[in-house]
């Protein structure tokens, strides 16, 4: 192994875990108290986190097991799909995941600028004013050049950013714990009381449905270490970092959701404007708490944005190394950063940023679509684990036995399907249209390969035809108004 190859494999467990935490915890956590209290009492909130934690554990464990038994698959999410189900499925998962994170990063730009409006009103209001577009565009290229300086250097900055992100979260937890009163927490625990100030929240099942729409998306980013597995010092670090990041984030989410119920009543929390953590601390400790949370929001979003800039450039780079994306994406600079992938990705982000200026409503729709587009990657990974567990090639030795892998894969598939269903049919059909846009790029990449027959085998053609027909069906349903956008 050359020194240049070694230099690219320099991410340890802490750096990878930092990537996971920073990828998962973004600006949304600062609105979590209000988001949860808007539809549920404390009892239903507890149940929703138990159910979500149970389901996401199997997704996290899927990545842990796969990184342990197949450490040779160093391109993570994309390669699991390709290895298990062929080049076209692998490409489609990689393409959809790439688009998802590109638009997700532009979402971070919008959130950052909107958060700045707290300090500089009204210049950045909504995140789509001209100053906001200029500011967001500048940050897109700042992060581009940070990552160009090297993945390791960017990861160190990300770890530092994650630490500074967690500090205001810890302060919020400490302060809400200090003001916590059990009597307040137990008041209308199941959300059934009816008063003028506090209407009934309905049955526990209806409350669960409302909170699950929040918690279902809370762990998007859990695959952060897997995507970067090709740059890990030790393949075992990938699984360790994924589990550590998952448990850490679950703990933070539970505390953030429940402690405010002991400081303020449910109807008070439900009516606090977002970011609601700022409103909670403004009530409990005064203006300085509100300022702290708004600063924390900006740091959190910037830290997550840096993480996803690293990850989103790694996706086409990894796919191109295996011949599925165009070869140009494999070019690295002297710092071993995927330079061409970074520039192309940042350029697409820049175009998307300009679109935000003209249509904020369309942008909100796009964010919902991209939330759905990440889920096929989870589904394919869990299905691949299930497939491996049944094969004769599954490792006979080792701590992870085939039955455990099979159970994890099955439950991971079930939970992934539930997430896709919960996302809504409308956004699923929109996502299919975006996935179909990748077909010409797949065909172009396949034609240039010596093993072109593999790219255009019968099942690959069937897959392309199936996705294409679904996309055409979606376009028909949207154009005729049978499904309203």
UniProtKB/Swiss-Prot annotation:
Pfam families per record: AA_permease_2 (PF13520)
Gene Ontology annotations for the cellular component aspect, listed alphabetically: plasma membrane
GO biological process: amino acid transport
A molecular-function term among this protein's GO annotations: antiporter activity
TM ranges: 12-34, 38-60, 89-111, 126-148, 155-177, 211-230, 243-265, 291-313, 363-385, 400-422, 427-446, 461-483
Domain of life: Bacteria
Subcellular localization, as worded in the UniProt entry: Cell inner membrane
Topology within the bilayer: Multi-pass membrane protein
Keyword entries, A-Z: Amino-acid transport, Antiport, Cell inner membrane, Cell membrane, Membrane, Transmembrane, Transmembrane helix, Transport, Virulence
Family: Belongs to the amino acid-polyamine-organocation (APC) superfamily. Basic amino acid/polyamine antiporter (APA) (TC 2.A.3.2) family.
Biological function: Catalyzes the exchange of L-arginine for agmatine. The arginine uptake by the bacterium in the macrophage may be a virulence factor against the host innate immune response.
Note in the entry: Inhibited by L-canavanine and D-arginine. Resistant to cadaverine, L-lysine and L-ornithine.
Protein name: Arginine/agmatine antiporter
Organism of provenance: Chlamydia pneumoniae (Chlamydophila pneumoniae)
Gene: aaxC
